[in-house]
Amino acid sequence: FFISILTANAQSVVGKWKTFDDETKEAKSIVEITERGGKIYGKVIEILNPAKKDIKCKNCSGADKDKPVLGLEILKGLSKDGKEYSDGKILDPSNGKLYKCTVSLDGNDKLKVRGYVGISAFGRTQVWTRVK
């Protein structure tokens, strides 16, 4: 019984993930991915640079405008589609833009997060690592 739970959990995107800066490759934040109503969502639960702990999403629009990045939901409403999650959005707090998004596991401890405009070929992929 416990083995099946561990196996299922090991292959799930649900959990805590460390994000990295595209340019510097430094660890940036911890995002916790949860599932609600069959869709996944990701919230920033920790900002790793002490100087940036209090930053706000100045360039965001709507309900996210001027909200603290800490606690901000950046992955929004992705649905499972085979081995990946898609049909949702990712918010880039640095520029306030929402992008279409796909998320897929690469092994148990790496998560490929792709944000794009229009078609997936015009985008970029980040690799997040599982926090244990």
PLM features per residue range, with description:
Residues 21-92, 98-99:
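Central antiparallel beta-sheet cores of small beta-barrel/beta-sandwich binding domains
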Residues 60-66, 112-119:
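Short aromatic-glycine motifs in intrinsically disordered, low-complexity regions
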Residues 108-110, 117-132:
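Edge beta-strand at a domain terminus
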Residues 3-10:
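Sec/Tat signal peptide C-region and signal peptidase I cleavage site
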Residues 22-24, 93, 104, 118-119:
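Short polar/acidic secondary-structure junctions
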Residues 35, 80, 105-106, 130:
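Generic beta-strand structural signal
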